Structure formats: C-alpha cells, structure tokens
Amino acid sequence: MNYFELFSFTPTYQIDTALLAERYRELQRAVHPDKFANASEQDKRIAVQRTAQVNDGFSTLKDPILRAEHMLSLNGIDLKHESTTVKDTLFLMQQMEWRESLEDISDSSDPDTAISDLHESFSDYAKQIAEELSGLLSSTNEAELIQAADLIRKLKFMAKLQIELERIEDALFE
C-alpha cells in the first residue's frame, strides 16, 4: 500500500508533519469502526482493516527512517528484512568513535557535557544524511536508490546509538 496516496501526499522525504497529523485525524474519523456499529459484518471488517492501514500509514510517514524505507519499497527496494551492513569505512570509524564516547560517559568528570556533545554530534551527522537522502529518494535511478538505502542503514544505526545514549543518560541522572 502506498501510504503517501492514502494521506494525499506526493512521495517526498520531507513532509509537513502537522498536515500529516491533520489528515490522520480526518481519515480516522472517516473509517473509525464505531461509525460502522450498525453496518454488516463485512463492512465492520473493512472498517477495522482501513483503520489499521491508516494507523500503519501514520506511523510510517511520521518516522523519517520508516518513511524513507517506504519510499524505497515503492521503488522495489525492501530494507525491512535485510541483513546488509554499512560498508563505508569512514562511517565505521565514526561509529567506533561514538561507541567509545558512549562508554566513556559514565567515567567522565562532566557527563552532562559529554552527553550534550554526543547529542550534537548525532544531530549534525543525521542532518547531513537527511539532506542527502532527500535528494536521492526523489530519484528513480537505481544507483541513487541504492545510495539512499546505504544512508538509511546509517540512520538506523544512529537511531540505535541515540537510544543507547538516552538509556545511559537516564541511568546517570535517576
């Protein structure tokens, strides 16, 4: 299913999340199963299915990584069940630096600054990737879409690091 069509969006990486939320509420009102309480069993099932599609679509489009994966899947590249890893040597070195920085936080004399610096580093890197990804995802060129897939893999890794950083932050400041 094309969630961009469901929400009346042109397939693009950058979307208006406020408009997405507005369209989500409109779709929810239109297909909510309660509206079909007196309908046939088949219509009730269809309403439940449509509600699930709307919920899945909203979750997918509001998350930048899932949105990017969805855009690739619309072009025949499925990343959901893959095991390919990032092969970019510079990124792998950066990854190791971030991991070391994460490990060093608890021993740091100023963990607040260390955490803040890592958040900033993650954010800066993710912004660079997002800008590049936006252009690549608008392409139908297979080589550019494969490049986009590599960038999505990097974003997925960074999301895991971000979760780990938040876990460390929570543990330190409980």
From Swiss-Prot:
- Which InterPro entries does the record cross-reference, listed alphabetically? DnaJ_domain, HscB, HscB_C_sf, HscB_oligo_C, J_dom_sf
Per UniProt, residues of the J domain are: 2-74
GO CC terms for this protein? Answer: iron-sulfur cluster transfer complex
Which Pfam families does the record match to this protein?
A: HSCB_C
- Asked whether the UniProt record includes Phosphoprotein among its keywords, one would answer no
Biological processes, Gene Ontology terms: [2Fe-2S] cluster assembly; protein complex oligomerization; protein folding
Which key words tag this protein in UniProt?
Chaperone
Q: Give the Gene Ontology MF terms in alphabetical order.
A: ATPase activator activity; protein-folding chaperone binding
Q: Which SUPFAM superfamilies does this entry report, sorted A to Z? A: Chaperone J-domain, HSC20 (HSCB), C-terminal oligomerisation domain
Q: Which family does it belong to?
A: Belongs to the HscB family.
Query: Could you give the subunit structure recorded for this chain?
Result: Interacts with HscA and stimulates its ATPase activity.
Q: What does this protein do?
A: Co-chaperone involved in the maturation of iron-sulfur cluster-containing proteins. Seems to help targeting proteins to be folded toward HscA.
Q: What is this protein called?
A: Co-chaperone protein HscB homolog
Q: Which organism is it from?
A: Shewanella woodyi (strain ATCC 51908 / MS32)
